[in-house]
Amino acid sequence: MQVLHVCSEMFPLLKTGGLADVIGALPAAQIADGVDARVLLPAFPDIRRGVTDAQVVSRRDTFAGHITLLFGHYNGVGIYLIDAPHLYDRPGSPYHDTNLFAYTDNVLRFALLGWVGAEMASGLDPFWRPDVVHAHDWHAGLAPAYLAARGRPAKSVFTVHNLAYQGMFYAHHMNDIQLPWSFFNIHGLEFNGQISFLKAGLYYADHITAVSPTYAREITEPQFAYGMEGLLQQRHREGRLSGVLNGVDEKIWSPETDLLLASRYTRDTLEDKAENKSQLQIAMGLKVDDKVPLFAVVSRLTSQKGLDLVLEALPGLLEQGGQLALLGAGDPVLQEGFLAAAAEYPGQVGVQIGYHEAFSHRIMGGADVILVPSRFEPCGLTQLYGLKYGTLPLVRRTGGLADTVSDCSLENLADGVASGFVFEDSNAWSLLRAIRRAFVLWSRPSLWRFVQRQAMAMDFSWQVAAKSYRELYYRLK
């Protein structure tokens, strides 16, 4: 079984979001599971530099100009690169310029990505041809459409990492991207009078996956579907929509081997976690005290992530004696709010604006509770890292958060399945009730330790996801 992942970023070469983490880990897990998985990426500068052994496979003149297809390896995974400097050799973000305006030729840049993905199934590399083209998010959404236009030389899977990003372009670009005008149709890639790369993936793929079972259900509902609910409800009825949970890359995220921690630990040596907490308290300007629960946030600061609720609930958290350490950037209003809280509550609130991968490990290793109060969350990786590190997740019941964290209710504690704290409604009062439950559990150290050990024993490895995808691919054949 030969599978080509078509996508726009891959950790650690280039990362703007969780998609990169998936592509950085899933193909390697699939190879270990017996699937010949490779990855197709645009040759953005950071990616091109990282694949040092790239060799020329093919040269083509395309609707988007001349391209060279390269093939090399990264961390044992075969990587195809679309080398088109006029499209991809730009500094900074792969999607927008330094003023945060989307590149005006994005329609060509990402249509080309889908086109090359489909061409791979038609023999662009004469020595390797995929049985399944697995496209990810809107950037790769045209790959299933180009496959459909070619009579489907391979099966296709389209994975929705976040339905909010739709890749919308003016209709006249149909003249530029070498797809039949008949595809510009409500039963096709047309959406509200425009081309939607996302809808192309949803409509033309043989199967759609979302990054958690709950998110797969949620995106059939109007409040989560961004206008795609009719199509997604139809795919659900046809059995062509399912959810596969993302995993944790245990080579990078494991408290037992994490060199970024002051003190490494396992579920059997949880007392060694305390050193990480005191080091984190020092680094964040908090009072060093192992008796108070340290809550943490590692997130983009947006209302989607529910960080306004944290700001609103913060006085209640601090009144009960807790501390907050926050690492993140985003909405200027939220940034200012958290910085003001740090100034108002010195020693209790520590804030670092920005994102530093290394420091996020130190927070995960040192905090007691990781807050993930998202309004929606397709899968979420932060809560999985929390479980792995014995840093109990406090989450809202949505998307992948609902699938991965079990509340410390009396029933769940008795049944041995409790792993964190879960609240229902997206408001500060509901969040504060969950925070209160965290304080109650914290007051019983042996029970807290029991839940930590339970959380750390859960298996969210990529091997589980790789097996689910392999079974899906074989069902499509």
UniProtKB/Swiss-Prot annotation:
Binding residue positions for ADP-alpha-D-glucose: 15
Tagged with keyword Ribonucleoprotein: no
Class in the EC hierarchy, top level: transferase
Keyword Cell membrane: no
Pfam families, A to Z: Glyco_transf_5, Glycos_transf_1
GO biological process, one term: glycogen biosynthetic process
EC numbers: 2.4.1.21
Record keywords, A-Z: Glycogen biosynthesis, Glycosyltransferase, Transferase
GO molecular function, one term: alpha-1,4-glucan glucosyltransferase (ADP-glucose donor) activity
Pathway annotation: Glycan biosynthesis; glycogen biosynthesis
Catalytic function, reaction form: [(1->4)-alpha-D-glucosyl](n) + ADP-alpha-D-glucose = [(1->4)-alpha-D-glucosyl](n+1) + ADP + H(+)
HAMAP family for the chain: Glycogen_synth (MF_00484)
NCBIfam families registered for this protein in UniProt: glgA (TIGR02095), PRK00654.1-2 (NF001899)
PANTHER family with a match to the protein in the record: ALPHA AMYLASE DOMAIN-CONTAINING PROTEIN, GRANULE-BOUND STARCH SYNTHASE 1, CHLOROPLASTIC/AMYLOPLASTIC
Family: Belongs to the glycosyltransferase 1 family. Bacterial/plant glycogen synthase subfamily.
Function: Synthesizes alpha-1,4-glucan chains using ADP-glucose.
Protein name, per record: Glycogen synthase
UniProt source species: Shigella flexneri serotype 5b (strain 8401)
Source species taxonomy: Bacteria, Pseudomonadati, Pseudomonadota, Gammaproteobacteria, Enterobacterales
